[in-house]
C-alpha cells in the first residue's frame, strides 16, 4: 500500500442524491478527465502535491495512465508544465504508460515504465480518480521494481460509494 492523498470526494453518476457542491465537484472532475482542468483545480493539485510529501523532496512526477495513451496526455498535458515549475522537479507524462490500451470489457491493464527515468527517484504519481487503489498499487510496484526509491500518490478525487 502506498501513501496517497486526494483533493475532493467523487460521487459517481449512479448516486443521484448529491448536494449542489458535490455536483459541482463531479463536473470539475469530468472537465479534468476531458482535458479541461480549471485554474482552481490546477492550483489545488500543485498545493496538495507540495504538502503530500512535505517531508521528502520529490525528484520526479509522473501520471497514472488513463485507459488509453491519448486520454493520459489529454488529462495531464495542461498541468505538467505548471507542476515542473512549481515543484522544481522533472515531470514525465509517459514515465509510466500502458503497453497497450486497456481492454474496455475486462479493464485489464499492462503497464510499462521508463526504467532509466525512474531509477533512484522519489516519485509522485498523480492520477484522476482513486477507487480501489489497484492502479496505484500496480504502478507503484512497477516503479519500485524498476528502481524508484519511493512512491506517493495524489489523486484529483476519491470515489465515495
What are these regions (language model features)?
Residues 1-60, 94-119, 159-161:
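Active-site-facing substrate-recognition patch
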Residues 2, 84-92, 146-150:
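Structural alpha-beta junctions
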Residues 10, 14, 137-161:
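PRPP-dependent phosphoribosyltransferase catalytic core
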Residues 19, 69-74:
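Short, flexible/disordered intra-domain loops and linkers
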Residues 59-71:
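Short beta-strand-loop/turn "lid" adjacent to the catalytic site in phosphate-handling enzymes
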Residues 60, 124, 151-154:
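A structural signal for isolated positions on well-ordered beta-strands in alpha/beta enzyme cores
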Residues 72-124, 134:
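Short, glycine/charge-rich flexible loops or terminal/linker lids adjacent to PRPP-binding catalytic cores
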Residues 127-139:
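A phosphate-binding catalytic loop at a beta-strand-loop-alpha-helix junction
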Amino acid at each position: 500500500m502506498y501513501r496517497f492523498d486526494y483533493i475532493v470526494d467523487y460521487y459517481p453518476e449512479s448516486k443521484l442524491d448529491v448536494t449542489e457542491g458535490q455536483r459541482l465537484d463531479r463536473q470539475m472532475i469530468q472537465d479534468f478527465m476531458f482535458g479541461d482542468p480549471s485554474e482552481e483545480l490546477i492550483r489545488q493539485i500543485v498545493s496538495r502535491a507540495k504538502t503530500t510529501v512535505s517531508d521528502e523532496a520529490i525528484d520526479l512526477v509522473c501520471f497514472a495512465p488513463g485507459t488509453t495513451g491519448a486520454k493520459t496526455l489529454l488529462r495531464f498535458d495542461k498541468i505538467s508544465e505548471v507542476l515542473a515549475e512549481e515543484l522544481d522537479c522533472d515531470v514525465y507524462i509517459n514515465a509510466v504508460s500502458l503497453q497497450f490500451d486497456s481492454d474496455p470489457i475486462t479493464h485489464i491493464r499492462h503497464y510499462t515504465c521508463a526504467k532509466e527515468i525512474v531509477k533512484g527517484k522519489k516519485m509522485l504519481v498523480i492520477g484522476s480518480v482513486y477507487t480501489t487503489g489497484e492502479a496505484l498499487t500496480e504502478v507503484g510496484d512497477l516503479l519500485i521494481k524498476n528502481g524508484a526509491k519511493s512512491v506517493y500518490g495524489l489523486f484529483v478525487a476519491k470515489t465515495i460509494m
